[in-house]
Amino acid sequence: RLNEQDVFVPALVKVASEHPNQKLLLLACGDDYAKLIIKNKQELLPHFAVPYIDESLMERIVLKENFYEICEQYGFAYPKTALCTFENKDEFNMDFTYPIIIKASNSVAYWNCSFPGKKKVFVAHDVAEKNAIIKAIYESTYKDNLTIQEFIPGDDSFMRVLNAYVGKDGKVKLMSLGNPILEEHSPEGIGSYAAIINTFDEALLDKVRFFLEDIGYNGFANFDMKYDSRDGEYKLFEINLRNGRSSYYVTASGHNLMQYVADDHMLNIPQELTYAKDKHLWMIIPKGVLFKYGKEGPLLDEARQLIEEGKVTNHLYYSEDFSPKRWVKLTLNNLNYYRKYKKYFNNKGLS
């Protein structure tokens, strides 16, 4: 029940009261908790350092339809997009061609619904498939909007992820750009990155830095985008207000994300702008899965080279937190990845 409004603030205030002489830093790992922190920021500030934006800015950038309006203002490209509502679901159509992406506009509400064939993101290749997916979603408890987008051509390696930390002074302190090699393909994991190599694009980083500073952002920001080979532009999908699981690729490359926020809010250590450039491979899947399902080419060759050089990290493996029981669990987890990729690879329909 911690994710319920009437429980959330009292529970956190109680935690703070148990540490009266300590400065506490409040961070969220999920969308629902990040939003709760932001909505209750003024009540929490007397008890915690709260490195998050205000609610008014959150409302402008979290819903995808609002985010794309801001993209227009700042010159960011984004996929052709249409909005399907519960009210217009039976007549809904869009003015772009198949295949299309179908995903929930409200990720928190979607997370809490259930229906047969549920996936984090769907790909529909024709009208019949589109209608079946929309019907299945709206027969569940989810009644919020659906974002319908053109499918940007290219495999997982065309994706990019950009992580940033913006200090309490409103200035960007750290930016890192990652090139995913492979995503997860299980129903609940579609779109979550499974292997990333750091890359660098100064023009893109400069553009995003100006955007974050100009809108008054602070705290962690995480952008998902895809390179469109048709016009040579990055198409922005969304901004997340917190780090994701794969954000450890930044720390693995030598720039500890948690150190940035701790130095800024807890220790008041001045920080200069850093663009991460060092190459490193982060992965959460076994190497066998990466090289079986990753697309052969320069990026996969680079992964092989980084592994050979020892520049590779799977953050589940930590020598200070290891035991026979944990080893068994991680081994089973790896075996499960082989099973999941065999079963679900490139299956993004309703079946």
Predicted region positions:
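Phosphate-binding site of ATP-dependent enzymes
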Residues: 124-184, 199-200, 206, 227, ...
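Oxyanion-binding "anion nests"
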Residues: 189-190, 198-223
